[in-house]
């Protein structure tokens, strides 16, 4: 785990727990086991992933956290692919809020009441500004 991320967690007073997933080599895109490494009992847990497609992994991870005593589970993903049956899975999971960005258009038939959509427009605008002013785009992600 990168030192910078550990330092970021220390700054905001958070602890790290890791969910180890195992893939079944005989089944494509399917995880089978989720092990929670770290103390989550009585805590609000934030699941972070790069994307949420069918939401199988995310929802299984949320169930594992609740099984280990998590008080609340919030999930965040940069790219909301949301292929079927993602909406159904999320709506029937212990995930209280799903936070995603607008890097992809969300289909009109997707109904996830607990979903919060954040715009990446300010980040893109700042990146363009940095490029035109000979600044650093990398600095936006530090």
Give residue ranges: language-model regions.
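PRPP/pyrophosphate-binding module of the type I phosphoribosyltransferase fold
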Residues: 10-112
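Peripheral docking tails and interdomain loops at the edges
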Residues: 109-142
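Short, small-residue-biased leader/transition segments that mark boundaries at the very start
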Residues: 1-6
């Amino acid at each position: 785990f990168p030192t910078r991320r550990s330092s970021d967690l220390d700054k905001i007073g958070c602890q790290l727990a890791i969910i180890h997933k195992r893939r079944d080599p005989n089944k494509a895109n399917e995880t089978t086991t989720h092990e929670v490494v770290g103390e989550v009992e009585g805590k609000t847990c934030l699941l972070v992933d790069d994307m949420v497609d069918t939401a199988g992994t995310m929802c299984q991870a949320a169930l594992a956290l609740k099984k280990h005593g998590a008080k609340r589970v919030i999930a965040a993903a940069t790219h909301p692919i949301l292929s079927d049956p993602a909406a159904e899975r999320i709506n029937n999971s212990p995930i209280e809020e799903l936070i995603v960005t607008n890097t992809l258009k969300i289909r009109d038939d997707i109904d996830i009441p607990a979903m919060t959509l954040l715009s990446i427009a300010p980040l893109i605008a700042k990146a363009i500004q940095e490029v035109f002013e000979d600044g650093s785009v990398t600095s936006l992600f530090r």
